[in-house]
């Protein structure tokens, strides 16, 4: 029994939950809902850590952005050490450098975790408007970056208000997209959906890991990452089809 426990412990997947949250001036209208929505997401990830502790190790990164600055509120923090977001942490202003926020965040994350053997990255982008202020990255470079990371098993969800979120997501090669109503309730509802989708994915991942522990031939890293991507897409589709 001890051997099996040790084997399972060695197979834990390090899961990086990355949330890139627009902090431009127009988010003021839904500021409280955005803070509440993130905190609900954080609670969900903490529950996942408790429920799937044998197979998963969760970390949280929260990036907020406007044209004044991109702020790493949390950077790969173990979920148990992540604190709730406060209104003081999130004060909307200025414009929307979406591409720069994505580019800098994803590139840095990739450099820091690319050598981890068993890793899953779940990225959610939340914005209420179109890109309008980036200086370093453009649509083409973000599209190429997302495509590269997707091949490595990263999964992305784009949630947008006041726009065609599906069209914007497709322009960046992001498969999973949701429109949300530009209101407090619409923001909370969309973020709850994202939390439910994550929990579905974590459950599927845990089941797969438990089954894989008894396989004679372990998956290669490439096979495993491809499988993680498919599981995440299936979890998104299931939530959308409810």
Question: What do these predicted ranges mean?
Answer:
Residues 1-242:
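Acidic, low-complexity intrinsically disordered regions
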């Amino acid at each position: 029994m001890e051997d099996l426990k040790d084997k399972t412990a060695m197979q834990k997947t390090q899961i990086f939950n990355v949330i890139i949250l627009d902090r431009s001036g127009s988010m003021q209208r839904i500021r409280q809902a955005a803070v509440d929505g993130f905190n609900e997401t954080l609670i969900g990830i903490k529950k996942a850590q408790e429920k799937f502790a044998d197979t998963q190790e969760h970390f949280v990164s929260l990036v907020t952005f406007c044209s004044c600055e991109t702020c790493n509120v949390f950077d790969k923090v173990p979920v148990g050490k992540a604190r709730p977001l406060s209104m003081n942490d999130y004060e909307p202003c200025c414009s929307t450098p979406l591409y720069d926020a994505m580019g800098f965040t994803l590139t840095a994350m990739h450099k820091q975790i690319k050598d981890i053997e068993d890793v899953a990255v779940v990225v959610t982008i939340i914005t209420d408007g179109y890109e309008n202020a980036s200086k370093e990255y453009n649509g083409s470079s973000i599209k190429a970056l997302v495509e590269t990371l997707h091949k490595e098993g990263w999964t992305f969800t784009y949630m947008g208000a006041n726009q065609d979120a599906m069209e914007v997501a497709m322009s960046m090669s992001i498969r999973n997209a949701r429109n949300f109503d530009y209101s407090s309730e619409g923001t909370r509802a969309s973020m709850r959906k994202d939390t439910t989708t994550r929990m579905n994915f974590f459950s599927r991942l845990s089941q797969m890991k438990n089954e894989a522990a008894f396989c004679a031939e372990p998956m290669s890293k490439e096979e495993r990452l491809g499988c993680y991507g498919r599981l995440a897409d299936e979890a998104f589709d299931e939530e959308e089809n409810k």
